[in-house]
Each structure stands twice: as C-alpha cells, then as structure tokens.
C-alpha cells in the first residue's frame, strides 16, 4: 500500500507529509515539507524567510510524538499564518504589488497615512 500524502493549506502556507525528490512531492510519513506563500502575495527578504522557517522548526519540534494528522497539520499552518501576520504588522514583510491579485488578505498595509 502506498503512503498517503497529507496536506494542510492556508492562504500563505502549504504543509505536506512528503519530501521533495527531483521537483516532485514523494509521500513520506516522517517528514513535513513547507511551501511558503505559493501565490507570491508578499515580498520576502532572507530574514523573514528564516524567521518563518525557524518558527516552523519550533512547531514541528513541539508536536514531536503527536500523531501526524490533519488536525495537527492545520494547527502548525495556523500558527505559521500568525507569524506571517506579525511580520507584516511589524513592517518587516510587505505585500507584493505585482501579485496576481492584490487583496490585502492580512489587512491593509501599515503606512503613516493609514495609522
């Protein structure tokens, strides 16, 4: 029987119980793969990416020993969404003006004119 690929999808975070092999997802019940902002809604700098990746590692470690199921994947994804929102509200992350659809999904940008 083939391994089942579990996934959790939020607006800016996709988690898979898989590993990437030659550009393809291969189900792996012992590994989580993070796909960050697949729609390129934000302009990412290295610091913000590292912050989210570190938070991902912390969450995975905190859930060690718990079942790798849809519920726990959603919890991790929701926590990561919260981390992204914090970066945006702190002005460390910004919306991508060239995004396919600019909908300000995490609220309006914090600019001096809007504060």
UniProtKB/Swiss-Prot annotation:
Reaction catalysed by this enzyme? a plastoquinone + NADH + (n+1) H(+)(in) = a plastoquinol + NAD(+) + n H(+)(out); a plastoquinone + NADPH + (n+1) H(+)(in) = a plastoquinol + NADP(+) + n H(+)(out)
> EC number(s) for this protein?
7.1.1.-
GO terms of molecular function? oxidoreductase activity, acting on NAD(P)H, quinone or similar compound as acceptor; quinone binding
Give the bilayer topology.
Peripheral membrane protein
User: What GO cellular component entries does it have?
Assistant: plasma membrane-derived thylakoid membrane
Q: Which InterPro entries match?
A: NdhM
Q: Where is the protein localized?
A: Cellular thylakoid membrane
Q: What class of enzyme is it?
A: translocase
UniProt entry keywords in alphabetical sequence: Membrane, NAD, NADP, Plastoquinone, Quinone, Thylakoid, Translocase, Transport
Per UniProt, subunit arrangement is: NDH-1 can be composed of about 15 different subunits; different subcomplexes with different compositions have been identified which probably have different functions.
Q: Which HAMAP family match?
A: NDH1_NDH1M (MF_01352)
Family label: Belongs to the complex I NdhM subunit family.
Relate the protein's function as given in its record. Answer: NDH-1 shuttles electrons from an unknown electron donor, via FMN and iron-sulfur (Fe-S) centers, to quinones in the respiratory and/or the photosynthetic chain. The immediate electron acceptor for the enzyme in this species is believed to be plastoquinone. Couples the redox reaction to proton translocation, and thus conserves the redox energy in a proton gradient. Cyanobacterial NDH-1 also plays a role in inorganic carbon-concentration.
- Name the record gives this protein: NAD(P)H-quinone oxidoreductase subunit M
Q: Which organism is it from?
A: Synechococcus sp. (strain CC9311)
* Top-level taxonomy: Bacteria, Bacillati, Cyanobacteriota, Cyanophyceae, Synechococcales
């Amino acid at each position: 029987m083939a391994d089942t690929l579990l996934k959790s999808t939020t607006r800016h975070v996709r988690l898979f119980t898989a590993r990437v092999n030659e550009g393809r997802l291969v189900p792996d019940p012992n590994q989580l793969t993070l796909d960050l902002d697949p729609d390129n809604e934000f302009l990412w700098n290295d610091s913000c990416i590292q912050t989210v990746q570190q938070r991902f590692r912390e969450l995975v470690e905190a859930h060690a020993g718990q079942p790798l199921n849809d519920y726990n994947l959603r919890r991790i994804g929701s926590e990561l969404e919260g981390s992204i929102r914090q970066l945006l509200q702190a002005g460390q992350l910004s919306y991508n003006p060239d995004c396919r659809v600019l909908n300000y999904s995490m609220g309006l940008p914090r600019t001096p004119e809007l504060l």
